[in-house]
Design a protein with these regions (language model features):
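Phosphate/nucleotide-binding beta-alpha loop and adjacent structural elements of enzyme active sites
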Residues: 1-224
Length: 224
């Protein structure tokens, strides 16, 4: 069905121009360029949300990549199990330590968050918090170790305000992703370059290589 829909979209593009993106801000097209000579690889998608909608990794998945999809929302992995059976699909939150944490579930799943203050800000029409549930959480390094995942090519994080906490749970010596996507909501580039997140990434040997409206692309200085 998805391929049929894509064919219909391509049919209306003049002269076959244009490219289809599944990500929220075209992040998957940036990744396609970054990995244009790599047909297979391993991704880890934290805050994966949906196997296709707003997905940074679906375009790579179609090319032959496989990996780990992680989302804390109850029931979120049912669609992944059906549409990405070759991946490891995990319903768990990523935090600095093993714990159970309150998770705010919205009528728009892309807004789901552990951040109570952000949830209060977003809880207004047309969006609404449907429930607050307790979910299991653990550091990303522990989760990947449990599933025997070593070096990866791409780490994509969309944790709605908790991206920096997720980054701090990575074992950078083991995973050493070639590319990291994370969010930063400042519109001021001077503020971005002065941020704790940017300092953290540069200290680990990463450079800011691209940016969409909210997403930052960091590439490893030792990337092959």
């Amino acid at each position: 069905m998805i391929r049929a829909q894509l064919d219909r979209i391509r049919a209306v593009l003049p002269g076959g121009m244009g490219r289809v993106s599944f990500a929220q801000e075209g992040e998957d097209l940036v990744l396609a360029r970054m990995f244009e000579h790599q047909d297979t690889g391993i991704y880890v998608d934290v805050g994966a949300h949906h196997p296709i909608r707003f997905s940074n990794t679906y375009l790579l998945h179609r090319r032959g990549w496989r990996g780990v999809n992680i989302d804390a929302a109850p029931g979120s992995m049912k669609a992944f199990a059906r549409m990405r059976p070759g991946d490891i699909n995990l319903e768990v939150g990523i935090t600095a330590r093993e714990e159970t944490r309150a998770f705010h579930v919205f009528n728009e799943p892309a807004l789901n968050t552990f951040d109570a203050e952000r949830a209060r800000t977003l809880d207004r029409p047309p969006y609404k918090v449907l429930q607050v549930c307790q979910v299991r959480c653990a550091p990303l390094a522990k989760i990947l170790r449990e599933h025997a995942i070593g070096a990866i090519d791409l780490l994509s994080i969309d944790a709605e305000g908790f991206d920096f906490e997720v980054l701090q749970t990575v074992d950078w010596e083991v995973a050493r992703p070639k590319v990291v996507i994370t969010e930063h909501f400042s519109r001021d580039l001077t503020e971005l370059f002065a941020s704790e997140l940017h300092a953290y990434m540069t200290a680990r040997g990463y450079q800011l290589s691209a940016k969409t409206f909210n997403s930052l692309f960091y590439t490893s200085a030792t990337r092959q």
